[in-house]
A protein has these predicted regions:
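C-terminal catalytic domain of Rieske-type non-heme iron oxygenases
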Residues: 1-236
Length: 236
């Protein structure tokens, strides 16, 4: 359980219209092997054994969560996040929750980020980011949360500009014909870089739209009953 019954409060908001397809930003927020893109993530997470000892938990309708892990901020010269943790979070903990179709909740111990994506056109996506703390925060605690938020996120943070560059480059290569397909073939026993959550997303996307994710422009009857192919769902 995370956050409990505490009231939340948004303290940061910014948005951007990105030159990419909506699904690519959803993919970026969902798959964890893209963490190799971020220097901060490589040093503080991927390089450590504990990062790889977590599992994805997959739920019906493609709502997913990655088990909480510990981030080693000292590996990047950043301070510990051991005080003022949000309810349900351990010191230096991190957890990511994905709500179908396009909402991500990312908690880094003391602060939460909420992403929402809105498709505007095939190559235009509105992305909105919110930094969230507790409504009960004292001024000192709120200042701490803002600092921790801006160390990694925010328009001038370390990660978001890299995410935007990645998804816009992906879209450009697709439009120009350099990359016709996206492959979601990793099977790692539901470990962090398993593609099971992405496969679940596209199975649910296909069910909702009545289209086969691997051939969306096919005419005629399309089998959108994916219950026979989802073998990785967590029973709840």
């Amino acid at each position: 359980t995370h956050l409990g019954q505490e009231e939340l409060e948004v303290f940061h908001y910014h948005r951007a219209i990105t030159n990419t397809n909506w699904k690519l930003f959803v993919d970026n927020n969902s798959e964890l092997y893209h963490e190799f893109l971020h220097v901060l993530n490589r040093r503080t997470a991927v390089a450590h054994k504990s990062y790889h000892e977590r599992n994805w938990l997959l739920y019906q309708n493609s709502h997913n969560i990655i088990q909480q892990g510990v981030i080693h901020y000292d590996s990047y010269g950043l301070g510990e996040r051991s005080e003022g943790a949000l309810p349900g979070m351990q010191p230096n903990g991190m957890v990511v929750m994905l709500l179908f179709p396009d909402v991500m909740l990312n908690i880094r111990a003391t602060v939460m980020r909420i992403d929402t994506m809105t498709p505007l056109a095939p190559g235009k996506t509105l992305v909105e980011w919110r930094g969230v703390g507790l409504k009960s925060d004292t001024p000192d605690v709120r200042a701490m949360r803002i600092q921790h938020h801006n160390e990694v996120w925010g328009p001038a943070g370390r990660n978001l500009p890299e995410d935007i560059a990645a998804v816009e480059t992906q879209w450009e290569t697709m439009v120009q014909g350099g990359s016709r397909y996206s492959l979601f073939a990793r099977e790692e026993g539901l470990k962090p870089q398993d593609d099971a959550n992405l496969r679940a997303f596209y199975q649910e996307w296909g069910r909702c739209l009545g289209r086969a994710p691997n051939d969306p422009f096919r005419h005629g009857n399309v089998d959108t009953d994916v219950s026979h192919s989802i073998k990785e769902i967590t029973n709840v």
